[in-house]
Amino acid sequence: MGNLVIGSRGSELALWQANHIKERLKKECLIESEIQIVKTKGDKILDTPLNKIGGKGLFTKELEELLLKGAIDLAVHSLKDVPVVFEKGLDLACITKRADVRDTFLSVKFPDLMSLPKGAKVGTTSLRRSMQIKLKRQDLDTESLRGNVQTRLKKLECGEFDAIILAEAGLCRLEIQGAKYRKAFSVEEMIPSMGQGALGVEMLKNHKHFATLQKLNDEKSAFCCRLEREFIKGLNGGCQIPIGVHASLMGDRVKIQAVLGLPNGKEVITKEKQGDKTKAFDLVQELLEEFLQSGAKEILEKAQLF
């Protein structure tokens, strides 16, 4: 039998992630594999903000189509990019141990967000980040920043932006120091995206190695990420809308923090729930109900106009 084929986007970070799974497959599952690079819609359209391109699965759809055809055996994703509803026959075979979940501030001239001058230009791909930046500093100018990690850093160094916000996990995986000033926000300062820091391996549910890949699953990370995905699912959300949600375990207790609002930092709802781990999914439903009662659906409809 030939090697398993891993589908991956072509960026340096995506290939790091695919190679990480390839190495673990060999070491922990005794399975040989090879990587096939796939360009997704999100990779091809680089001159438009992600939320303007439209549709879910901007970084996953082409990979899912190849999975369904049997052209690749598994697809490695940043879990935050994976839609919460799967194409029929597909599912996550595993969720890996989470890396650092935080978002990170980078700048050549300024040590942190609060030291930026009025009107400073902050680059981010994410409406979620833009919303939380504007909530703290309404006077800042948040602008779309596309491209891979290195491209974004180059734009910062060339002076196109006064600061940019990137995921700490990506910087750590690529061993990038970044700019002169680098400061991670706490989860309380900026609630991450669902699944941020984790990798999701997607396969056909009837693939003969689907169960085998459970060996790569991290139970604690998977539990927390599934709670976050359940919250997003309840709001009909995706990764291109201004919602942050983070679940964490502290012994037998779970804490779920969430934020939702307009990208301009207006009409923001922030709530959290804590309780027994055994009641975790009930807590998600309670949190959802509170958000819906506070007008979450209406706010998300308005957010589509940005």
Curated annotation (Swiss-Prot):
UniProt key word Ubl conjugation: no
Note on how the cofactor is bound: Binds 1 dipyrromethane group covalently.
PROSITE patterns xrefs: PORPHOBILINOGEN_DEAM (PS00533)
EC number, as in UniProt: 2.5.1.61
GO BP, one annotated term: protoporphyrinogen IX biosynthetic process
SUPFAM superfamilies: Periplasmic binding protein-like II, Porphobilinogen deaminase (hydroxymethylbilane synthase), C-terminal domain
Co-factor(s): dipyrromethane
One Gene Ontology term of the molecular function aspect: hydroxymethylbilane synthase activity
Transmembrane feature ranges: none
Keywords linked to the UniProt accession: Porphyrin biosynthesis, Transferase
Pathway given in the UniProt record: Porphyrin-containing compound metabolism; protoporphyrin-IX biosynthesis; coproporphyrinogen-III from 5-aminolevulinate: step 2/4
UniProt cross-references to Gene3D superfamilies, sorted A to Z: Periplasmic binding protein-like II (3.40.190.10), Porphobilinogen deaminase, C-terminal domain (3.30.160.40)
One GO CC term, this protein: cytoplasm
Catalytic reaction annotation: 4 porphobilinogen + H2O = hydroxymethylbilane + 4 NH4(+)
Modified residues (S-(dipyrrolylmethanemethyl)cysteine): 239
Highest taxon of source: Bacteria
Subunit structure, interactors included: Monomer.
Family: Belongs to the HMBS family.
Remarks, miscellaneous: The porphobilinogen subunits are added to the dipyrromethane group.
Function: Tetrapolymerization of the monopyrrole PBG into the hydroxymethylbilane pre-uroporphyrinogen in several discrete steps.
Annotated protein name in UniProt: Porphobilinogen deaminase
Organism: Helicobacter pylori (strain ATCC 700392 / 26695) (Campylobacter pylori)
Chain's gene name: hemC
